[in-house]
Amino acid sequence: MPMTSKRVLVLAAAAVKLLACSSASEPVDMGSAGAAVSAGGPAGGGAGNPLAGAGGNLSAAGGLTAGGASPSGGAFAAGGASNSGGAFAAGGALAAGGASNSGGALGVSGGSSAAGAAGAGSTSNCAVAPIDPSATPEAKKLLCYLYSIYGNKVLSGQQETSWSNPQGDIDYYVQTVNKHPAILGGDYLYTDGAKLGNNTSVRAQAYWAAGGLTMLRYHMGAPPLADTYDNSKGAVANFDNLTKSGTSENTSLNSKLDYMAAELKFLQDAKVPVMLVPYHEIDKFAWFWWSKCTGAQFINLWKYSVDYITKTKGVHNVLWMVGYGHDGAMADFWPGKEYADLGGIDQYDKGTQPFANLYAGTKAVVGPTMPIPLHETGTIPQPSAMFPTAAPWLMWNVWATYQNTAAEGYTWNTPETIKSAYADSHTITRETLPNLK
């Protein structure tokens, strides 16, 4: 038996023992928010590989952590010990067909995959297609689903607190409403580091296996700076050089895109589609380096990045999402529908109103038919106020710990507002997503 297969079988047995002996989850330390990300090799193995590691660890919930055996061929079980597209179940058994793990691999507290459950939109006879002509079947199916629900349903989402206890964010919803958000948000800034506790791509794969969706972003350091949050607010000495072959800026950008492509390729091999917001919060305040430029310069960067990831690196499981910032969508920073599958916005205003002005402004830029996500928000807009016409967002995605904290002197989302939003008939959770595999 190959060594990788032996390692996986040992890990599976350990998972059974772990779950049998303990009902408590142990917090996972993801390291500090400013931890630098290494632009290492592919996720499948090699130097700098954020997934590689000796001795394979088990997460507190029973799934494989990033420090464990590197998944091969898109399955947790390498070398032929396949899990048939699913994830490890709570008892350590292999779950077929993407079934949920009750207590394992992000399926905490009884999450279910809800194949064919309510909230599904029809994806038959779909007339839309991703901008990537070589898009994977999973990416195509996901985009069709998003279009099918747009205007009638809204996807719930939660960004993980990657620098603390990432599972804690999801657990909070289970404890509060006994449901999981439909979307798990992750960030490739926090994939690697000295205190790595769980890998972004592995967690995304596990959430997909348990029946959920994933949306990823990347707080990329300004080339040639290292990838830290502070460096994502830096500046590029010569922005035009980013897309000019042979320049130091271009070499650095390519290295960062190589790193992201390797992570996305890992998910592609696992047949996981990704909603990707590579350069989010584009706005006139120029919070991040990719906004410290003209609209034409940003569009060149965007198109270069899309072409590099898809054509040069062979990544085809991505739905490309342009993400505007708090002050509204900017038409001169819009790359066009030929280079964007979705166009959305971030916001941090207080209250549970539908933020109709931001929705209308974004719609004026991206067009009347493209689904518009609220892909980062401090507060949850109440679905009862969003529909049918005020602001029928495709999704909301609550940022990090804003679901239950009194950050900046006030509470962002009380348990009462969370319960109201998740109980609304318009809201789709992980439990009510259809089987999109």
PLM segments and residue spans:
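Bacterial N-terminal signal peptides that target proteins for export
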Residues: 1-10
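Ser/Thr-rich, Pro/Gly/Ala-heavy low-complexity intrinsically disordered linkers and tails
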Residues: 13, 18-124
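Boundary/entry segment of secreted carbohydrate-active catalytic domains
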Residues: 124-176, 180-189
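Alpha-helical scaffolding within the catalytic cores
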Residues: 141, 164-173, 198-202, 259-263, ...
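Substrate-binding cleft of secreted/luminal carbohydrate-active enzymes
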Residues: 150-161, 370-437
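Aromatic-lined carbohydrate-recognition surfaces of secreted/lumenal glycan-active proteins
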Residues: 157-159, 277-279, 302-329, 369-380
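Substrate-binding cleft of extracellular glycoside hydrolase catalytic domains
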Residues: 193-315
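Aromatic- and acid-rich polysaccharide-binding/catalytic face
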Residues: 330-353, 397-399
